Amino acid sequence: KLGVDVLVTSTQKALALPPGMAVCTLSQKAYERTASVPNRGCYFDLRSIYDTIQKKDYQYTNTPCVSIMYAMDLQLQRIMQEGVENRFARHEAMAEFVRSWADEYFSVFANRDHLSRTLTVISNTRDIDIAALNNVLIERGMQLGNGYGDLKNKTFRIAHMGELTMDDMRSITSNIVDILKLK
């Protein structure tokens, strides 16, 4: 539908599962292309992995994390019950809420043409102590992410994906306002 030939993701993001498993799918076109790739290695040899799975009645080349597979089965059922488009719309509504809040109290870090539906990176325009803020948030049962590398303490991240709800977004943003005594 979207023309994607290879898609790789992990279980711990928008699927809202524990980390521990990568998920990959490839189109027939991508599968055929793998035949001409020299030195595919072992770990990323998608052709060999696919062929083995097909020959051995879906037995994987490595031991999979079976508990995550069962959890993913349940989670995919939940996603289908909600409806994929409804889930995307919920993520987008939460993203818009967080961005609006960020614009009021800080600023959104990313270029507006490249915003994510699942995570908002916020510029630390008030030079707050993000670690201290996070410590109080953790005591209140929530957490945000500090920036990485050169952006550590210059940005922070609020996720709006998986099973999170608009109430969760209202809660974390109002708690940040309360903790920092923002006006």
PLM feature spans:
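Conserved active-site segment immediately N-terminal to the catalytic lysine
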Residues: L2-Q12
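Active-site C-terminal subdomain of aminotransferase-like
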Residues: L15-R99
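Short beta-strand-to-loop capping motifs
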Residues: L26, I122-R126, H160
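Flexible, glycine/charged-enriched surface loops at secondary-structure junctions
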Residues: G83-R90, S107-R112, G147-Y148, K183
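Conserved PLP-binding catalytic core of the aspartate aminotransferase-like
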Residues: E92, V108-L137
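Short amphipathic alpha-helices in soluble, non-transmembrane regions
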Residues: A132-E139, I172-V177
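Conserved PLP cofactor-binding pocket of PLP-dependent enzymes
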Residues: R140-R157
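PLP-dependent enzyme catalytic core of the Aspartate aminotransferase-like
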Residues: K154-K183
